[in-house]
Amino acid sequence: WVPILESWDFEERTDLVAPSLYHAIYHYLAYVIVEDDLGEEVANNYANNWYFWQERIQDLVVQDYGRYWIDDQRTKDQVEDLHDLIRRAARLGAAKLQAISGDEPTTLNWGEIHKISFVSPLRPGGPGSRLLGGGVFEKEGSGETLNRAGYSRTANIEDGFDTSFVAAARLVMDLADPEKIKAVVAGGVTARQFNDHYDDQIPVWVDGELLTWWLSKDKILEQVKTKLTLTTNVKEMD
C-alpha cells in the first residue's frame, strides 16, 4: 500500500486505487484509537457518527496530548504510536475491501466501491427501483472535497463506501450579471415521475457541468420551448 499512497496526488478520482486504500484506513482509524478505552460496541457507535469524532480525532493525532489516547491501554509492556494504529487500521481496512469486492485491495479503484444511486421515493429499493430511479454512477470525491460525496460508516464489514450525502445543488453566480446564473441540481426541476424534467439534469451533474439558468423575464421568454397554461373549468352556478 505504501508506494501507492506515497505517489498519490490526493485527488479522489474514480479511476485511482489510492482513495480506496486511504478511506479503508480512515474508516477504521477512529475506531482503533478509542476501542481499547470504550470497548468494541461503544467504539463502533462512536466511529459511526462523523460529527462525534472527526474534528477531535484529527486534532489529537497531530497534538502531543493525543499519545495518551493512541497508546493501547491493554498492552502494559509497550507504548503504541500513531504508526502502530494506522497499521492496525490498514489490516482491518484490507479485510473490508476484500469483503466488499472479493478482489485484491491494491487493484480496487475508488469508483468501483464509491457510487451514487438516484432512486425514486415511490420505489427506493427492490424490483422496479432501477426503472423508476435515475441510475447508478461512479462518484469521485468524498465528504471532504468540493462537490462532496460522503458515505456513511457502519460496523458491518460488507457495507461499502457508496455515497449517502452529496452537494446536491451547484451554483456559480456572477454578481455583475443580473440576467443569469450557472447551476445544476442532482435530478431535475420537477418531482413528477416520468416527466421529461424529472431526471434530465443528472448527466450534467454527474459530469460536473453547469447549465445556464435565466433570471431575466425577457431572457426566459426567449428560451421558452414549452408552455404550461392553467385554466379553470368551473361552471357558473345558478
What do these predicted regions represent?
Residues 1-238:
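Long, compositionally biased non-active-site segments enriched in small/hydrophobic residues and glycine
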